[in-house]
Amino acid sequence: MGCAQSAEERAAAARSRLIERNLKEDGIQAAKDIKLLLLGAGESGKSTIVKQMKIIHESGFTAEDFKQYRPVVYSNTIQSLVAILRAMPTLSIQYSNNERESDAKMVFDVCQRMHDTEPFSEELLAAMKRLWQDAGVQECFSRSNEYQLNDSAKYFLDDLDRLGAKDYQPTEQDILRTRVKTTGIVEVHFSFKNLNFKLFDVGGQRSERKKWIHCFEDVTAIIFCVAMSEYDQVLHEDETTNRMQESLKLFDSICNNKWFTDTSIILFLNKKDLFEEKIRKSPLTICFPEYTGGQEYGEAAAYIQAQFEAKNKSTSKEIYCHMTCATDTNNIQFVFDAVTDVIIANNLRGCGLY
């Protein structure tokens, strides 16, 4: 009887060990499948992060991608110039030379006829170059926080000769700088450090937000993007709400959302290069009237970080913050490496394997 019982006990113990081993293997496998949700207000750099993942973790852009982005570069460039020209009368800025009026008319005509995605004609290229060199246009550009303008405007308009060449082909950096509004959900899959990543980018504009929250309650982590440089700008959607205040509000609603109680949150304070330039001449008090610090990058950036971290109401949830420049591949590679290490540690801890 004793022998029979010990045989049963041994069999039960063996079964128990097998179940535990299977559970552990399942846990390890589950810990290898990483779902990341990329969130943030419109134009915070989410789509650029997705493009960087293609460059860093996939085989980069295809020949077809380069071909498809060529008209986008043309359109982004001419539409940026149009945005500046349209703002001039609103800001009571004159051209330094009256002849620029006819150049501006040519640029407006091209956009009106919806030819903005086509290569620049020689006449159009010459007109755009004259306009961009005009002192009045440059003055209006320097006040771009007072109207809506793509971040990449200067990047493209400073390089009109290259973009206007007959044999122009976009570079990787050109593609990273392009702006196309994201609608719906963009999904990217890649492997890194023996993990299988699924990255979801969701349209940032207000009208899109209600579509995603409940669908992603099982994500491993949220990467929340904030454009640091937008502290002195207002929204496209209503032109009265400060963009950074809107970002803070959205971060609050995500960070403390019931669906994401146990979800790691990684905060990308993005566009640090533009912020570093801007903070010298545009005070942070535009967004945070109570700020008493200096007009200096380190102090101002730390203050912005503290405002976002203060929104976290959970004592058990940590916010992992990084200052980023989404158009800088080396910077994003370095930051994503650090992010992955945090995810690995958290995931293994969650499975009881760390």
Swiss-Prot record:
Protein family (similarity comment): Belongs to the G-alpha family. G(i/o/t/z) subfamily.
Record-linked Pfam families: G-alpha (PF00503)
Lipid-anchored residues (S-palmitoyl cysteine): 3
Summary of subunit composition and partner proteins: G proteins are composed of 3 units; alpha, beta and gamma. The alpha chain contains the guanine nucleotide binding site.
Gene: Galphao
Name this polypeptide is given: G protein alpha o subunit
GO process terms (BP): adenylate cyclase-modulating G protein-coupled receptor signaling pathway; asymmetric cell division; axon ensheathment in central nervous system; behavioral response to starvation; calcium-mediated signaling; cell adhesion involved in heart morphogenesis; cortical actin cytoskeleton organization; establishment of glial blood-brain barrier
Role, per record: Guanine nucleotide-binding proteins (G proteins) are involved as modulators or transducers in various transmembrane signaling systems. Plays a role in glial cell differentiation during embryogenesis; loco, Galphai and the G-protein coupled receptor, moody, are required in the surface glia to achieve effective insulation of the nerve cord.
